[in-house]
């Protein structure tokens, strides 16, 4: 819903390159949650979307790193949390490489249900995201 993205009291942010072109967006807090998940533990929820033309270009790791750095500076959380559709393999791989791990899964949707993973990561200086780190072992 475009109207929701434009609400000033929501935590959506456009991300632009140096030339002013749209790279993607991010959101924080309840705006990044999916109905049906258990969000009882204190953590900063993070959602993102990379411009479709930029997917697969190698920008996603830096994109996520910048979003996490912004979220850490603005909100000072102890943990980051992300909710990702199980079918979104690229996004799951991105978050896992950034040190997130799956803590739950659930179904969401009234008409057509989709399974989601909730992933968590501690915010700690010694655990900063390194885009050159090796990918974790593949999840079964």
Q: What function would you assign to each model-found segment?
A:
Residues 10, 113-120:
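Short hydrophobic/aromatic beta-strand or adjacent loop that forms the aromatic wall/cage
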Residues 73-84:
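Conserved GNAT acetyl-CoA-binding A-motif
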Residues 83, 99-116:
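Conserved catalytic-core motifs of GNAT/GCN5-like acyltransferases
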Residues 54, 58-67:
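Conserved acetyl-CoA pyrophosphate-binding loop and the N-cap/start of the following alpha-helix
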Residues 45, 79, 90:
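Amphipathic alpha-helical recognition patches that constitute DNA-binding helices
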Residues 61, 86-104:
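Conserved active-site alpha-helix within GNAT-family acetyltransferase domains
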Residues 1-53, 70, 122-123, 138:
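Acetyl-CoA-dependent GNAT
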Residues 120-140:
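Conserved N-terminal entry element of GNAT/NAT acetyltransferase domains
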């Amino acid at each position: 819903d475009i109207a929701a993205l434009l609400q000033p009291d929501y935590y959506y942010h456009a991300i632009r390159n140096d030339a002013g072109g749209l790279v993607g967006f991010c959101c924080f807090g309840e705006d990044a949650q999916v109905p049906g998940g258990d969000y009882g533990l204190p953590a900063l929820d993070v959602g993102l979307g990379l411009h479709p033309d930029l997917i697969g270009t190698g920008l996603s790791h830096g994109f996520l790193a910048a979003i996490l750095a912004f979220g850490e500076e603005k909100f000072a959380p102890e943990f980051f949390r992300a909710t990702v559709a199980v079918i979104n393999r690229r996004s799951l791989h991105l978050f896992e490489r950034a040190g997130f791990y799956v803590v739950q899964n659930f179904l969401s949707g009234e008409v057509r249900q989709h399974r989601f993973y909730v992933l968590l990561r501690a915010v700690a200086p010694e655990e900063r995201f390194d885009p050159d780190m090796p990918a974790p072992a593949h999840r079964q």
